[in-house]
C-alpha cells in the first residue's frame, strides 16, 4: 500500500493511492475537504463533499488472497470505477463494477466458485446488485438485491438468493442445495424492552424467509456443535426439507440417516419450530459403545428454543 498526499487550501489532495499484490492493484485519486472531518456547525463550506475515484480495472480477482485469508486464489478480470462523494455522515457512491467468468477458491471449501459473474451499479445513495451468479458443481447460485447507504430501515435493503442444484463439498458438509431465500426488513413489536401499559415500540430487524431443500448430504462433524441462542434478533419464516440420502457420519460419534422437514418462524431470539426430523436407522457411539437408533425423531415442543426433544 502506497499513497501520495498533499495538503493545500484546507483540502487533502489524494494524488495517488495504490493497493497492489504482484501485478494486481487498486488505484485511487481525488480530493478530500478537511471540512468533512468537522462537525456540521463548524464547517466553513456547508456543501463540502469528497470526490475520490477508485479504479478497479487492474484489480482482478487475484488480489483477493491479499485482502482476506478466506480466499486461496482468484482468477478473472474486474472492470469498473467508483466515485466516492458526499460526506462521512452521508456518503454517496457512483459508478459500476463488473466481473465476467471469474473463478475463486475459498479456503476449507473443495468446490471452486466457477463462472462468477457480477454486475453492481452505484447510484448515489443506492447500491443495486443487478446480478451475482456462480456455478457450484453442476448447479448454480445466484443473487440480486439492493442496499441504501442512508434511508429508513423499512426499505433499506433487499437480497434475493436462489440455489438451483448447487453442489458444495467440504470436510464438514457435502451435498446438493435447492432454495429460494429473501432477506428484507421486518417490522416487529419490541416486547423485550417494553415497560408499562400501552403498545410496545415498533422496530425493524432483518427477516429471512423462503425454503431450502437438501439432497444427497453427508455431514461429518468431529464434535457436536453447541447451539447458543445468541443476542442477534433476526426474523424467521423458513421451510427446511430433507430429501433422500441425508447421512450424518463420523466414525467415532455417529452413523445416522435422516428424513423429514421443519418450518421455522418467529425470530432467532424466540423461534417457533414445527415438524419432525426422523432417524429410521443408525447408531450413536459413546465411550466406544454403540447405541442403535430405531425410529427416533427430533421434535420441538416448547417455543422459544432451537433445542429439540428426542422422541
Task: Give the ranges of each region predicted by the language model.
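Structured alpha-helical
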Residues: 53
Amino acid at each position: 500500500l502506497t499513497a501520495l498526499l498533499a495538503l493545500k487550501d484546507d483540502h487533502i489532495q489524494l494524488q495517488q493511492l495504490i493497493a497492489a499484490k504482484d501485478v494486481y492493484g487498486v488505484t485511487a485519486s481525488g480530493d478530500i475537504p478537511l471540512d468533512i472531518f468537522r462537525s456540521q456547525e463548524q464547517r466553513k463550506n456547508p456543501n463540502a463533499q469528497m470526490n475520490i475515484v477508485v479504479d478497479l480495472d487492474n484489480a482482478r480477482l487475484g488480489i483477493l488472497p491479499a485482502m482476506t485469508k478466506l480466499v486461496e486464489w482468484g482468477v478473472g478480470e474486474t472492470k469498473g470505477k467508483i466515485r466516492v462523494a458526499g460526506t462521512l455522515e452521508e456518503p454517496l457512491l457512483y459508478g459500476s463494477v463488473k466481473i465476467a467468468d471469474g473463478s475463486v477458491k475459498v479456503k476449507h471449501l473443495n468446490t471452486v466458485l466457477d463462472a462468477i459473474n457480477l454486475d453492481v451499479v452505484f447510484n448515489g445513495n443506492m447500491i443495486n446488485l443487478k446480478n451475482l451468479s456462480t456455478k457450484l458443481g453442476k448447479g448454480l447460485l445466484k443473487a440480486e438485491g439492493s442496499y441504501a447507504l442512508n434511508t429508513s430501515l423499512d426499505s433499506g435493503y433487499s437480497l434475493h438468493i436462489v440455489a438451483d442444484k448447487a453442489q458444495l463439498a467440504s470436510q464438514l458438509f457435502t451435498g446438493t442445495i435447492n432454495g429460494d431465500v429473501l432477506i428484507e426488513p421486518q417490522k416487529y413489536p419490541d416486547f423485550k424492552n417494553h415497560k408499562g401499559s400501552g403498545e410496545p415500540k415498533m422496530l425493524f430487524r432483518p427477516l429471512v424467509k423462503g425454503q431450502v431443500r437438501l439432497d444427497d448430504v453427508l455431514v461429518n462433524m468431529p464434535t457436536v456443535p453447541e447451539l447458543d441462542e445468541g443476542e442477534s434478533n433476526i426474523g424467521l419464516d423458513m421451510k427446511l426439507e430433507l430429501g433422500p440420502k441425508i447421512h450424518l457420519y463420523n466414525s467415532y460419534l455417529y452413523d445416522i440417516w435422516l428424513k423429514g422437514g421443519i418450518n421455522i418462524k418467529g425470530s432467532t431470539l424466540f423461534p417457533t419450530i414445527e415438524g419432525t426430523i426422523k432417524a429410521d436407522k443408525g447408531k450413536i457411539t459413546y465411550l466406544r459403545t454403540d447405541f442403535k437408533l430405531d425410529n427416533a425423531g427430533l421434535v420441538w415442543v416448547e417455543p422459544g428454543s432451537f433445542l429439540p426433544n428426542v422422541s
